């Protein structure tokens, strides 16, 4: 966007484009539409869907984007009553969401578990391949004039007395007038280079995949187990972000998201655990997640897992995005947080 507005942009990437969280996630998009009074979340979710439409439909990038909609499983009567009220409230505020019976859900997702009390359906949610999408954004930026430098691990950032910054990597030095920190889970160490404390914690997410299969799952899939638990206690404190699946090493809830990729792989994940910069997968957690997924899509219980992986997500301590100007530094901006 900056390059399209004729700004001179240099992007420094520690590894390769899409090599970490931007390329390791499930690839789910969007919320429940714009609503009657769009807020920041609306722009970040529904706005993202519009950007993907533009990139794929208008600009011709193959991002495997489609507006598939999301089905979120409701597992018991207490959850059903809670989300029945929630759906009414959201619809009154102009959001696109429906409460479906299991029979209605199976009419649009035949493999869904027909024994559950119901499902929430959000037609304005979509999906895309995260690696293809991130690389497409990088290519579009270069076509608009941005310069992308990969394998540039930043080791220091120095404010200049005349304004601007010097950024030192392991191999090069760069200077700029304005600096944007879009460093995800690495906000803490990068912030320390500038003498500022950024309240973002690395949270490990992990996923698993089956072999490629003919099309069996049409929507992105979720579950209300976690959101219902977080509605009662989000688990946050002064050092712990809200809405995690573990606290102090113990599981507090189960979280779920997944879809079937264009290549036929079925991928699911959900765990959110504060473990520092730990990329190792936990086989026990993977199995808990697979069992959770099979409660929603039963045939998954019969499929072997062929690969697993993990990535780090940037969770802010208050659960809100951190976007905008950093007030204690001139010409310093940040885009981070979940």
Segments (PLM) and residue ranges:
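Active-site substrate-recognition segment that forms the wall
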Residues: 1, 29, 33, 62-65, ...
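Glycine-rich FAD pyrophosphate-binding loop
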Residues: 3-25
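Dinucleotide-binding Rossmann-like beta1-alpha1 core, especially the glycine-rich loop
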Residues: 27-108, 255-256
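Short beta-strand to alpha-helix junction loop
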Residues: 43-46, 72-82, 121-140, 149, ...
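C-terminal lid/capping helical subdomain adjacent to the catalytic/cofactor pocket in oxidative enzymes
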Residues: 4-7, 99, 146, 161, ...
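Helical element adjacent to the flavin cofactor pocket in flavoenzyme catalytic cores
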Residues: 120-178
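Short loop/edge segments at beta-strand edges and connector loops
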Residues: 13, 101-102, 150-152, 169, ...
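Hydrophobic anchor at the start of a short beta-strand
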Residues: 7-9, 97, 179
